[in-house]
Amino acid sequence: MAVRPIIRFPSPLLTTSAERIGRFDGTLRQLSDDLVDTMRAAPGIGITASHIGILQRLTVIEVDPQTGPRSFVNPEIVWQSSETAWHTEGSVSMPGVAEEVERPVRVRVSFQTLDGETREEEAEGLMAVCLQHEIDQLNGIFWIRRLSRLKRERAVKRFEKFNRAEAFPGTQ
């Protein structure tokens, strides 16, 4: 297991659709383990292979440390509720920035396990938000595209300011 470097916004890899996974082997398990380590180190509660520059349809989500991380291979939303709610979102690829995003409150997702078993399950609350956010990422939709133009521009400016402060501590 290893912490991998995270691709930062505005890399074009973050707006590129990931490829379906067809091989379920030790390499996939290793990638999943590395994603868990990288997500926790970021820190974050969700990450995709795209975030580390690997364009494969794998996401790891950990909304509750008690239940641990979950891996979703080739996830797809097959149903979503018409009821929506606003939630604060951000990205490990755009640290220092968070905004309110409106999403359906419940979703049903079809996915495969690390062993290749196909499953379908319904999620609500934070897990539903995370699944939608990470599946968007796998589809090449970076989260700020869900914002209004004005909010998106402000988010980018905040990120640029965060990057300057990170590169040159003590400056603004």
Swiss-Prot record:
GO terms for biological process: co-translational protein modification; translation. SUPFAM superfamilies: Peptide deformylase. Coiled coil: none annotated. CDD domains: Pep_deformylase (cd00487). InterPro entries: Peptide_deformylase, Peptide_deformylase_sf. Pfam families: Pep_deformylase. One of its GO terms (molecular function) is peptide deformylase activity. The active site is at E134. Belongs to the polypeptide deformylase family. This is Peptide deformylase-like.
